[in-house]
Design a protein with these regions (language model features):
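Residue-level detector of anion-binding/catalytic polar loops
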Residues: 3-4, 56, 98, 140, ...
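Rossmann-fold dinucleotide-binding core
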Residues: 37-118
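Proline-centered loop/turn at the N-terminus of a beta-strand
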Residues: 31, 56, 75, 198-200
């Protein structure tokens, strides 16, 4: 076959396969579509291995739950040569009707997917923290869910605005400064203490706000907090 598609539990499983099949290995005319998703080091090592045996590598990730593969909810991120991406689009479309070509930067899929995971995990963990606060205060989780769903469009708009602000470097213009958000977080921490909930998440947030303010960015937009992650 011209294409070899791999989607395994981890790169260790992949390495076990190739380590046992390297006698007279020749990948000339073949493209490996690697959807296992590894670390930056694993991706670069695999690329060197594929080149050694005269093959082409498409590095990618499947961004969805297993039950969503092949549905409109799925998304595949790919990196590699444009010719390889175009040649394998029929195969990729079976796994996901939507795919995005990230160009020749082979580490782009793994970094981009992890970057998205950072935002998604932070939001979901914060939401779970909020749910526990509601439970401790005898507030219905149906009410909590309703307000989360009702305000979701605002979070989406704010996410877009913050990413654009980071991209342009304009982190001064704001309706709500780091200081204002910080006061809100201090109040959240105080409520968490009063309700005797676990403080790990809120203390971590509090530390981030303090670092941002110490960096002289208290009057800047919340997007300025990106500076402390650099």
């Amino acid at each position: 076959s011209q294409f070899i598609v791999a989607s395994l539990s981890n790169y260790e499983a992949w390495n076990n396969i190739i380590d046992s099949n390297q006698i007279n290995m020749d990948l000339s005319g073949k493209t490996i579509i690697q959807l296992t998703t590894g670390s930056i080091e694993e991706v670069t090592t695999l690329n060197d291995w594929v080149k050694k045996y005269n093959g082409e590598l498409l590095e990618g990730i499947i961004s969805c739950f297993p039950s969503q593969i092949g549905t409109e909810e799925s998304l595949i991120l790919l990196a590699g040569s444009n010719n390889s991406v175009n040649n394998c689009k029929d195969i990729i479309s079976v796994l996901s009707p939507k795919y995005k070509n990230l160009g020749s930067n082979l580490i782009a899929p793994t970094v981009l997917s992890r970057a998205f995971l950072s935002g998604a995990l932070g939001g979901l963990i914060g939401m779970m923290n909020g749910a526990v606060l509601c439970q401790k205060a005898d507030i219905s989780l149906d009410d909590f869910k309703e307000i989360c769903m009702d305000r979701s469009s605002i979070i989406e708009q704010e996410s877009r605005r913050i990413i654009d602000a980071i991209s342009t470097g304009d982190t001064k213009n704001t309706e709500a400064s780091v200081s204002a958000w910080g006061h809100g977080q201090e109040a959240l921490l105080a409520i968490s203490k009063t309700l005797d909930s676990n403080l790990d998440f809120q203390l971590a947030l509090n530390k981030l706000f303090k670092k941002t303010i110490e960096a002289g960015l208290k009057d800047h937009d919340l997007s300025a907090m990106c500076e402390i992650f650099k």
